[in-house]
């Protein structure tokens, strides 16, 4: 069992003292009763607690961080938020107020979330997810003019200012998928590939499509069609039967760039279609199709780490003025049935 993270607050609770007293005990120049100091240091040593270099942050004003997630697909947004919450708990030594707002894309599109966004106008920093649609540009521009400390998760807008983005590289993901499909089909005379992407107004999906087209050219794959449709509802999944009817058994490989791929997997499985399928992300409903062989491989972008990186780097910027890289990438990995267990708990 993992040991509970020990923080200044843990030590304070065990000894019945204030967190600020615990913080002062580690400063030899701070005014504190020597018996109290000795007790605090002995307790800290007992639990192998070493104060963070930024523990002096306890005596300063509270940092306020807002999170606004406009979600289309719950398994994606949940993992991002989990990563943010875990990072928040690990940085419990600092005075941080974390407020999270979740908005369903079915109820409100990102460009309609100006009121929710403006609640955070006076916060020290803001983390956004789901605002990769070009339609969001106007409200993002207006907001960043008033609060420049904006961090994007999973996407990086092209035409508005932001502090940094925490994301995967869609170029690498597309190249990896194309190379995998090539290796599956390299001994076949026919190498017909279908590409399915999500919202065509999304910078992320557009980048992924362009990179995949180029990778197909490099690896000698025949991209017979690229379909871009809104993946927030059933628009993409409703087209699946007609796509397969159109190509009538001529599809050898498929890459889908959205995590909302269960309908595609169901169709392929139920109709026993022999095709090499590369999907995106892992979640309970998709894992079933990885295990039964419908999905040949899936791209893992580590959404939880994207959320964690966003929060940690933002806090370090606000406290220490550490300037982060403009884009912080998680590793892109390929998951198959044989290693799926390493990524699911």
Report residues per predicted region.
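N-terminal helix-turn-helix DNA-binding module of bacterial transcription factors
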Residues: 1-61
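Amphipathic helical "hinge" segments at domain boundaries
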Residues: 50-114
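Hinge/beta->alpha junction and helix N-cap segments in small-molecule ligand-binding domains
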Residues: 70-79, 100-111, 166-175, 195-214, ...
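Hydrophobic alpha-helical
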Residues: 125-144, 224-287
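Flexible loop/hinge segments that line or gate small-molecule binding clefts
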Residues: 133-172, 283-295
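Hydrophobic alpha-helical segments within soluble ligand-binding/sensing domains
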Residues: 164-192, 284-286, 301-319
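Hinge/cleft segment of the Venus flytrap/periplasmic-binding protein
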Residues: 200, 214-216, 302-345
């Amino acid at each position: 069992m993992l040991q509970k993270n020990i923080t200044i607050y843990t030590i304070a609770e065990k000894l019945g003292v204030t967190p600020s007293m615990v913080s002062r005990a580690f400063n030899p120049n701070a005014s504190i009763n020597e018996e109290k100091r000795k007790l605090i240091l002995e307790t800290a040593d007992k639990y192998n607690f070493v104060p963070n270099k930024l523990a002096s942050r306890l005596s300063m004003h509270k940092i306020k961080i807002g999170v606004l997630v406009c979600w289309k697909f719950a398994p994606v947004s949940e993992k991002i938020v989990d990563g943010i919450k875990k990072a928040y708990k690990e940085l419990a030594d600092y005075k941080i107020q974390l407020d999270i707002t979740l908005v369903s894309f079915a109820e409100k599109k990102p460009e309609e979330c100006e009121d929710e966004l403006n609640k955070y106008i006076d916060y020290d920093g803001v983390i956004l997810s789901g605002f990769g649609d070009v339609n969001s540009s106007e409200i993002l521009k207006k907001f960043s003019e008033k609060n420049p400390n904006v961090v994007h998760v999973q996407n990086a807008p092209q035409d508005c200012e932001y502090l940094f983005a925490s994301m995967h590289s869609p170029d690498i993901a597309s190249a990896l998928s194309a190379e995998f499909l090539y290796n599956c089909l390299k001994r076949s005379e026919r190498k017909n590939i279908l590409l399915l992407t999500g919202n065509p107004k999304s910078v992320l999906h557009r980048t992924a499509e362009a990179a995949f087209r180029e990778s197909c050219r490099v690896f000698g794959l025949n991209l017979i069609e690229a379909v871009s449709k809104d993946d927030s509802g059933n628009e993409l999944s409703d087209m699946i039967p007609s796509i397969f009817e159109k190509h009538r058994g001529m599809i050898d490989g498929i890459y889908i760039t959205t995590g909302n791929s269960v309908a595609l997997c169901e169709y392929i499985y139920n109709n026993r279609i022999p095709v090499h399928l590369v999907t995106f992300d892992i979640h309970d409903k998709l894992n079933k199709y990885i295990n039964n062989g419908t999905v040949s491989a899936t791209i893992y972008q580590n959404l939880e780490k994207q959320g964690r990186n966003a929060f940690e780097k933002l806090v370090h910027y606000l406290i220490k003025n550490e300037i982060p890289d403009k884009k912080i990438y998680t590793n892109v990995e390929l998951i198959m049935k044989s290693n799926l267990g390493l990524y699911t708990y």
